[in-house]
Amino acid sequence: MSAIDDLPPLREVIREHQLSARKALGQNFLLDLNLTARIARAAGPLEDATVVEIGPGPGGLTRALLALGARHVIAVEHDERAIPALRTIADRYPGRLEIVYTDARTFDVRPYLGSTKAKIVANLPYNIATHLLIGWLSAEPWPPWYEMMVLMFQREVAERIVATENEEAYGRLGVLANWRCETKILFDISPSAFVPPPKVTSSVVRLVPRPAPEPCDRRALEQVAAAAFGQRRKMLRQSLKSLPADPARLAAAAGIDPTRRAETIPVSGFVAMARELTNSRNDNTT
């Protein structure tokens, strides 16, 4: 990564700009450029790619993305202290780094993209990571504006994202993520790699949108999954009673025994129940 050798070490950048991590912003800075390069390569190929990065901080991952050939990086940062450090990187890569000072939770990147498909690559602030992911998974229309996500989460959250039926971590997030994407944990990163070190191991997850997920209404799917996993130890015939449809009818439409529990139902089963929930609503309005 000789292309960034003339930039200061990240520890020096943090010291110069007084970038002590703010707990309120969920910040844990990854300083090892070998690890940031590994994350960037996981989103490859990057040549000619447009990348959206959330929470770049001092810019370690930003530098890796640019050094590995990303044509355009849109860096969304909510900490005003980091902006000067990012501008230094922008000066080294003229016309390739666009810095957006805003809150990622309310930011719509699509006007910045036009018709270009992007990749989302980020060491996400832990306190908003799940919120952001659910927003991206809820994108309409589908397929979405991004072609891939390579994201870092706490290991526990990563396990929930990739979990499938009969796994302890399986829940609402796993249903939504695996309905719309192919998911995989790529590798773990030790707490010691961060400043300050978090209390938990982190994991890098890749999510690739499925071009044609099994058809159903997303909101209905979320509603069924929320009801089922809200009382995950109860049978479906009990846990689904909060829905505006007969639980037995929903289960029957999916070919599922209503005495089963949510954790044993595959994503396809939730999709089938969501379709039946939509059908029952339509029946009630005709």
Swiss-Prot record:
Look up the EC number in the record and give it.
2.1.1.182
Keyword annotations? Cytoplasm, Methyltransferase, RNA-binding, rRNA processing, S-adenosyl-L-methionine, Transferase
- Catalysed reactions, as listed in the record: adenosine(1518)/adenosine(1519) in 16S rRNA + 4 S-adenosyl-L-methionine = N(6)-dimethyladenosine(1518)/N(6)-dimethyladenosine(1519) in 16S rRNA + 4 S-adenosyl-L-homocysteine + 4 H(+)
SUPFAM superfamilies, per this entry? S-adenosyl-L-methionine-dependent methyltransferases
- Known InterPro entries for this protein? KsgA/Erm, rRNA_Ade_diMease-like_C, rRNA_Ade_Mease_Trfase_CS, rRNA_Ade_methylase_Trfase_N, rRNA_adenine_dimethylase, SAM-dependent_MTases_sf
Q: Indicate which residues the UniProt annotation says bind S-adenosyl-L-methionine.
A: N28, L30, G55, E77, D103, N123
> What class does this enzyme belong to in the EC scheme?
transferase
Instruction: Give the superkingdom in one word.
Output: Bacteria
* Compartments in which it is found: Cytoplasm
List the molecular function annotations (GO) for this entry: 16S rRNA (adenine(1518)-N(6)/adenine(1519)-N(6))-dimethyltransferase activity; RNA binding
Q: For this UniProt entry, what's an example GO CC term? A: cytosol
Which is an annotated Pfam family here? RrnaAD
Give the main location.
Answer: cytoplasm
Q: Which PROSITE patterns does the UniProt entry name for this protein?
A: RRNA_A_DIMETH, SAM_RNA_A_N6_MT
* Protein family according to the UniProt entry: Belongs to the class I-like SAM-binding methyltransferase superfamily. rRNA adenine N(6)-methyltransferase family. RsmA subfamily.
The function of this protein is: Specifically dimethylates two adjacent adenosines (A1518 and A1519) in the loop of a conserved hairpin near the 3'-end of 16S rRNA in the 30S particle. May play a critical role in biogenesis of 30S subunits.
Q: What is this protein called?
A: Ribosomal RNA small subunit methyltransferase A
